[in-house]
């Protein structure tokens, strides 16, 4: 494959509870749970006093998440929180790409027609979210004077190639997360990251890290073995890379 990926895979369920859950705000990321096959956390989003979404999320090496196990994880988590599940309202399941490395030129050789979003490789390399880049691409296309399949393809490819170059630092961090240690220890990387200043974290999610931000992320004692981190950075095609 032209791109090597990890994945943020999830199963989410919206439940009607038999009594109020007691939450006054979302629980964005509860990583105190058993890590299982990779970095795992549970996200809880209340919609009303007695309805909420519980999402079991895993940063894992392939897109396939064992659905039955994730559903049991949700039931177990609800029980631990004291939430009494009454009626399942809906379920969602998906996998977002996490870019490790790749050959963007080879990737685009497979595309004869204009494309956007995930098919164009236009997503945040660490979160997998595509909306901000979709908006930026729409702004770029709005400036075009001539609309043909060829000009659209060329413009989108140029835009995607520029984004790819700008995301090199993020891909390096992704390789440290996925390749520099055991899967069930990935939480250590995330724990250190979320201890950084709030403004830096916001710029990270926006894909707008400054040079001081990058230096701050890399400074201090690394959360993974130094040699393993260097191998992940310098040799992304090593054995542990995605197949």
What are these regions (language model features)?
Residues 142-243:
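C-terminal helical "tail/cap" subdomain of flavin- and related membrane-associated enzymes
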Residues 91-95, 100, 118:
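Catalytic cores of enzymes that engage adenine nucleotides and/or redox cofactors via long glycine-rich
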Residues 34, 96, 121:
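Surface-exposed, flexible loop/turn segments at secondary-structure boundaries
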Residues 1-88, 99-105:
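Predominantly flavin-linked oxidoreductase catalytic cores and closely associated redox partners
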Residues 73-77, 137, 189:
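Amphipathic alpha-helical segments that form well-ordered structural scaffolds
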């Amino acid at each position: 494959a032209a791109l090597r990926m990890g994945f943020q895979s999830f199963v989410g369920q919206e439940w009607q509870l038999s009594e109020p859950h007691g939450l006054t705000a979302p629980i964005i990321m509860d990583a105190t749970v058993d890590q299982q096959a990779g970095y795992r956390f549970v996200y809880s989003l209340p919609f009303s006093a007695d309805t909420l979404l519980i999402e079991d999320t895993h940063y894992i090496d392939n897109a396939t998440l064992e659905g039955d196990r994730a559903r049991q994880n949700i039931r177990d988590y609800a029980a631990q929180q004291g939430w009494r599940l009454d009626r399942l309202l809906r379920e969602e399941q998906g996998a977002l790409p996490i870019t490790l490395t790749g050959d963007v030129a080879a990737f685009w050789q497979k595309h004869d027609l204009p494309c956007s979003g995930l098919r164009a490789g236009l997503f945040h390399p660490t979160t997998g979210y595509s909306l901000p880049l979709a908006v930026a691409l729409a702004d770029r296309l709005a400036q075009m004077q001539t609309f043909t399949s060829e000009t659209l393809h060329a413009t989108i490819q140029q835009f995607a190639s520029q984004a790819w170059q700008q995301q090199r630092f993020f891909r390096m961090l992704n390789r440290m997360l996925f390749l520099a240690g055991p899967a069930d220890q990935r939480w250590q990387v995330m724990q250190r990251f979320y201890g950084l200043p709030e403004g830096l974290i916001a710029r990270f999610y926006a894909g707008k890290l400054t040079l001081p931000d990058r230096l701050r992320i890399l400074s201090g004692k690394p959360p993974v073995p130094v040699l393993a981190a260097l191998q992940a950075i310098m040799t992304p095609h090593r054995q542990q890379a995605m197949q």
